[in-house]
UniProtKB/Swiss-Prot annotation:
Keywords: mRNA processing, mRNA splicing, Nucleus, RNA-binding, Spliceosome. The keyword RNA-binding applies. It is found in: Nucleus. Involved in pre-mRNA splicing. Facilitates the cooperative formation of U2/U6 helix II in association with stem II in the spliceosome. Binds to RNA. Belongs to the SLT11 family. Associated with the spliceosome. It comes from Kluyveromyces lactis (strain ATCC 8585 / CBS 2359 / DSM 70799 / NBRC 1267 / NRRL Y-1140 / WM37). It comes from the Eukaryota. Residues 290-302 have a biased composition (Basic residues). GO terms for biological process: mRNA processing; RNA splicing. One of its GO terms (cellular component) is spliceosomal complex. This is Pre-mRNA-splicing factor SLT11.
């Protein structure tokens, strides 16, 4: 709204009304308008030790429906260029506008009662395909809570979907059919999801009962699948809209995930990738080797 100081067009966000309204200082032809470049009577005032100035003339402010200080739209409080872009979109094809940020949602909702409701479904769809962050993934979920989707991690990047499914079939004594499994793998991030197309409840419970388990904390249980020296950890995936190929590969991904894997491995009893060391001097194998060599020497002496 315009102020009571003559021809000024200053919004309440820049110049609040009330008892503490600051004193305005007038400078006749003190500035050049930002739009028309003509000189105009500018004003300045101070709020909380910050000085504000009018940077466009009242005529241009009235024409563009903007504040003389912040140049934002008077009604919606958004930048003028953003408002003009959205108006252009609305005029071209109002039904196709999808709000992409909070300002755009606010403007469309206030300026058109027809556009916003028509795009709610599209907006929800756009938000549903956002990138998942590592802290949102179900690394620490309870496998016993699995409804119909398993979450797999610590997968060797050289393994393929077919190889993992084959190992699952072996683990179920060939009772599980390949056509009944749906495994989505992200080799780069070493994660996957597993679902069953037929009898999902039955096969979910069967797999949980067959695979070896380990406990993380007092309440959380996980399963694991041994495969080519690699231990694939399995938990529950409780989110229906989770997509392994739509995960944000953050810089901290490796550090956070490796921390979880190392913790799991210590609970199971063997750290991942740990190799058997050489036998120490004085061990049984070492003594056995020495006795063999001594027998050979005695034979030669004879």
């Amino acid at each position: 709204m315009s102020q009571d100081t003559g021809e000024l067009k200053i919004c309440e966000r820049c110049l609040p009304l009330g008892e503490n309204t600051p004193t305005l200082i007038r400078y006749p032809n003190g500035r050049e308008c930002k739009f028309c470049t003509f000189p105009f009577d500018s004003y300045s005032y101070t709020i909380n030790h910050t000085t504000f100035h009018t940077i466009c003339c009242p005529k241009c402010a009235t024409k563009n429906l903007i504040c003389q200080v912040c140049l934002n739209d008077f009604e919606h409080g958004i930048p003028m260029h953003l408002r003009n872009s959205m108006k252009q979109l609305l005029n071209e094809n109002a039904d196709s506008v999808i709000p992409k940020n909070d300002m755009m949602k606010r403007f469309i909702g206030l300026s058109s009662k027809q556009v916003a409701p028509l795009n709610i479904d599209k907006l929800k769809q756009a938000e549903s395909i956002r990138k998942w962050r590592v802290r949102e993934l179900p690394f620490n979920s309870n496998v016993n809570d699995t409804k119909d989707t398993f979450f797999l991690y610590n997968i060797d990047p050289n393994l393929t979907e077919s190889q993992i499914v084959s190992q699952l079939i072996v683990a179920t004594n060939n009772n599980l059919e390949r056509e009944n499994t749906s495994l989505k793998l992200n080799s780069k991030l070493r994660i996957a999801t597993l679902t069953f197309k037929q009898d999902p409840d039955l096969w979910t419970q069967k797999l949980i009962s067959i695979l070896p388990k380990f406990k993380v904390g007092p309440t959380v249980e996980k399963c694991y699948l041994l495969m080519k020296g690699n231990r694939i950890h399995i938990t529950s995936c409780l989110s229906d809209d989770f997509d392994v190929n739509n995960v944000n590969s953050e810089p901290e991904w490796d550090r956070l995930v490796q921390k979880i894997i190392t913790k799991d491995a210590k609970i199971i009893g063997t750290e991942p990738g740990k190799k058997k060391g050489k036998p120490k001097s004085g061990s049984k194998s070492d003594l056995h080797t020495k006795s063999k060599s001594s027998r050979r020497r005695h034979t030669l002496d004879l």
